[in-house]
Design a protein with these regions (language model features):
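Hydrophobic, aromatic-enriched interface-forming segments
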Residues: 127-164, 194
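Catalytic core of PPM/PP2C metal-dependent serine/threonine phosphatase domains
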Residues: 79-141, 178-190
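C-terminal catalytic subdomain
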Residues: 2-3, 99, 103-104, 167, ...
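Short hydrophobic beta-strand that contains or immediately precedes a catalytic carboxylate
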Residues: 47-51, 131-133, 197-199
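Short glycine- and acidic-rich boundary segments immediately preceding or forming the N-terminal edge
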Residues: 1-33, 87-109, 147-163
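Short helix/loop capping segments that flank catalytic or ligand/cofactor-binding pockets
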Residues: 57-59, 140-142, 206-208, 260
Length: 261
């Protein structure tokens, strides 16, 4: 199934979300999460993507809690990761409410982990401010559709940076994995025709690799309209050597706002 949001014409941003699970898996096994939400101002919105670590227990739940907490809040910097107590308690309550075999319960006690990227967007000053931990990425692509170019990739900027063991945000607070020292922050300005892409790690790495080879896939991303389009893009990425993983992509464009410069 495709996950897509098409705001009404008065909304300041056009945002569409596409996602699919690993090849061979059921949709219920999808462990990424994404969220989009307006704010108390009609010219602002917040978006987030998280990638739950398959090796940990109930990571899909943890990823969903992270993105929902971010888009419903006001934090857009490292302070977001200083205030995870409420969703950590909620994760723990939801997990404790399930009947688990002893070995599954033991694994759950170690917690879930996820990579995260989120941003707040302001249509009036055209600014965006993003925060990230791990290898989910924001890609800022500039230029007219016929002449796209990558302006910024955050928090990873080269495909070779993927594949290691990035620090991930945990659902259980531990003294030896304080997330604050791993937080990255970036900001920019969304000009006319620019797009912001928020993607989970495997798709981010492929998009960067294509760009580095001089074979950018921005036109294909521009052309996405349906689930079939996205599945074709994912199949192309996998045929190109991308590992079999959940894939998530948010595509953001700014609409004209009366009074905006």
């Amino acid at each position: 199934m495709i996950d897509a949001l098409h705001p009404v014409s008065a909304a300041p941003f056009s945002i569409e979300a596409f996602s699919c699970q690993k090849a061979g898996n059921a949709r219920s096994e999808y462990e990424d999460a994404w969220a989009i939400r307006g704010s108390d101002s009609p010219t602002r919105c917040r978006v987030a993507v998280a990638d739950g670590a398959t090796e940990s227990s109930f990571s899909a739940l943890w990823a969903a809690l992270l993105v929902e907490s971010f888009v419903r809040g006001r934090s857009h910097g490292p302070d977001f990761f200083s205030n995870l107590g409420a969703i950590r308690r909620l994760w723990r309550r939801k997990v404790r409410g399930r009947r688990l075999a002893w070995y599954a319960a033991e694994k759950a006690r170690r917690g879930a982990y996820a990579a995260f990227v989120g941003a707040s967007l302001n249509a009036v000053n055209r600014g965006w401010r993003a925060v990230a931990i791990g290898d989910c990425c924001l890609l800022h692509v500039t230029g007219a559709p016929s002449d796209r170019a990558l302006a910024k990739a955050f928090p990873l900027s080269q495909s070779e940076e993927f594949g290691s063991s990035p620090f991930l945000v945990g659902s259980v607070k531990k003294g030896d994995d304080d997330p604050l020292q791993h937080v990255r922050v970036s900001e920019g300005v969304l000009e006319e025709n620019d797009i912001l892409l928020f993607a989970s790690d495997a798709l981010s790495a492929w998009l960067l690799r294509r760009n580095e080879r001089g074979e950018p896939a921005w036109a294909a991303v521009d052309a996405l309209r349906t689930q079939e389009d996205f599945e074709a893009l994912v199949a192309q990425a996998r045929d190109d050597g991308t590992r079999n993983d959940d894939m998530t992509l948010l595509r953001v464009m700014r609409r004209s706002v009366p009074g905006a410069s």
